Amino acid sequence: GRRWYRHLPAGYGWGCVGLGVFGLGGLADMAWHLVLGVEAGVDALLSPSHLVLFTGGLLILTSALRSRWGSGDVTSPVAIGGLALVTALVSFFLLYVSEFTASAPTLAFRALPEGHPQHTASELPATAGLGGFLITTALLVVPLIWTWQRARAPRGLLTTLVALISWLSAAVVDLDRAAVVGAAGATLGAVVAEFALDWLERRDLRARLRIPVLAAAAIVPTWTMHIAALAAGVGLSWPVELWSGAVVVSGLAAAALGGLAVSAPAAAVTAPRAASVSPSA
């Protein structure tokens, strides 16, 4: 007879693997806590047993998404909802490097000259903040790029991702004022970016430019409004070179990620596009 796993719907095989991984992770986590105690801070996000649970959960949550994408349906509510849910899960495990929890431009900045004994230490908060901008940029842009490779992203996808990640991050830090203000600004920026994305998609950009340009256009307004909201609602400590540079370098990083996507086989990128402009039922 046929093996049981061959009866699974397309895309759900790895979900079954995820169930096993999650179960093993739960047992490992219980043993870890009994022997080493319970984590209380950032170490909880890096605990090996928690990372096993994360891996299993990721495999489970992406089952419906893999199934939809396998059929060429990347813009239905199920596919978009699955993509947003997976992105939220990844963002939770990256909270320690998220701009939405750090609100880095509001943190104290003290510039000390090269050669000063405290020069490196004084710049650590700013460099960590810049890294947070870049990592959060990748977190937002990668799901968009995966969608753009296969279809025109539906309106509202960027706003959904930004709102979900930013407001969940604000909730994790007990609705800290800076986090709430930053989330509101980023969400408004994403709405503005949606208009730019829609306009650019109607310009029929050259294939090699389309995704890099769209990626930059998604990120620059989002971070610009995020920082503008922080400036108005909390106040910035970073000098203009830092906060403006954070926006520019994030836009460049987004475009670079989009450029890497262009190197994918043409059949995988362009063939489904015309067929997927209108969401499938």
Each language-model region and where it sits:
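Membrane-interfacial, low-structure loops and terminal tails that flank and connect transmembrane helices
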Residues: 1-12, 71-78, 203-205, 267-281
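Membrane-interface helix-loop-helix junctions at boundaries between adjacent transmembrane segments
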Residues: 3-17, 27-82
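Cytoplasm-facing juxtamembrane segments at the starts of transmembrane helices
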Residues: 10-17, 72-87, 148-164, 205-217
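Hydrophobic alpha-helical membrane segments
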Residues: 18-26, 186-193, 209-230, 248-252
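Aromatic-anchored segments of alpha-helical transmembrane domains
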Residues: 22-30, 85-95, 161-173, 216-229
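Membrane-interface interhelical loops and short amphipathic "cap" helices
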Residues: 31-48, 97-124, 174-178, 231-243
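Hydrophobic cores of alpha-helical transmembrane segments in multi-pass inner/ER membrane proteins
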Residues: 51-67, 130-146, 184-197, 245-265
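Membrane-water interface signatures at transmembrane helix termini and the short loops
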Residues: 166-195, 236-245
